[in-house]
């Protein structure tokens, strides 16, 4: 099931229209109205093959932790705007959002649960595969 979360009714309408135009049956889609920070916590662990995060950048750290929980092993996390107008790669850029995204990218590179790749397309896509991590003692 293709699940979309958005707080804006216009975005929800546009999503439904795009799904219909793509020929995706409505019973294969779910549009959830609400704040992603609250909705994500109610979704099922390990039930998703792909999670795309394209939301308020301040919320990215929370959304990413929830997304990792939602992904099955082998699932893919995609984050939009990870180059943030080419400022993330510029050490002289130190505004709050740039620093947040730079730190998040570094944290994801160091996260043993993920195999990340930053693609320099558009405003930067970070694509990360969730890998199997044995629990301690295994």
Tell where the protein language model's regions lie, with residue ranges.
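S-adenosylmethionine/decaboxylated-SAM
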Residues: 1-138
């Amino acid at each position: 099931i293709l699940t979309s979360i958005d707080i804006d009714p216009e975005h929800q309408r546009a999503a439904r229209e795009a799904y219909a135009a793509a020929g995706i049956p409505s019973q294969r889609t779910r549009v959830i109205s609400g704040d992603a920070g609250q909705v994500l916590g109610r979704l099922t662990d390990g039930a998703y093959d792909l999670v795309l995060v394209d939301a308020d950048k301040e919320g990215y750290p929370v959304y990413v932790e929830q997304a990792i929980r939602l992904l099955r092993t082998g699932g893919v996390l995609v984050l939009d705007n990870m180059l943030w107008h080419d400022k993330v790669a510029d050490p002289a850029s130190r505004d709050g959002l740039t620093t947040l995204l730079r730190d998040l990218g570094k944290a994801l590179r160091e996260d043993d649960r993920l195999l990340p790749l930053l693609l320099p397309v558009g405003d930067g896509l970070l694509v990360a595969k969730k890998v199997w991590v044995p629990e301690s003692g295994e």
